Amino acid sequence: MSDLKSLATKFASDHESRKLLVLPTVWDTWSAGLVEEAGFSGLTIGSHPVADATGSSDSENMNFANYMAVVKKITSAVSIPVSVDVESGYGLSPADLIAQILEAGAVGINVEDVVHSEGKRVREAQEHADYIAAARQAADVAGVDVVINGRTDAVKLGADVFEDPMVEAIKRIKLMEQAGARSVYPVGLSTAEQVERLVDAVSVPVNVTAHPVDGHGAGDLATLAGLGVRRVTFGPLWQKWLADTSAQQLKGWA
């Protein structure tokens, strides 16, 4: 547990450093090893790429115990901090969720407000903040400074669900920050103007998803840094790029 506490403290400190963190999203020990060897200070595990790599599907369709077994293999294979995407929590209480990710060796979580196991119900803003607050409390009781990355799909869901998705996203990331999230993740941002509005709304790092080759709709890594972005992950995009590139190369051999 002492090593876990040290990793968590380092990860939390990295998030408070005001520097831009790039945390590539991995799915197995091979991809995790590549990230560590490349010199990154931490990594993220994505539910989507893990599901694709294990013959399952995303949206909380994986068996959680099996998922945590994958996480444990990855955390055992690297020496850098690992954060895991837990979607909306897989139906677990915040305390149980924190206990299980710590057991698997992770020191961060990404938790979203769309509950896939309940017909893709969107949690109310305060409900989601309360879930994050309870997870924060559970981590504090365990004595591990878990980095909670609070995700909202408000912008991604758009005007079909919210009258003003950007206003809703801002409300939600503020509540998540107040609840103890160390970073916030408003998915679906595609322009510099959107990114700036969200960055200006909170003091914690704002996470954006970027493509490892094509960057983000707002620009490349330097542009994102200039906009105030302090955390970048890849979601399923690195894995998809590898798959697409490999498929093109393999065609000549078929």
Where are these regions (language model features)?
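Alpha/beta enzyme core
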Residues: 2-82, 86-236, 240-243, 247, ...
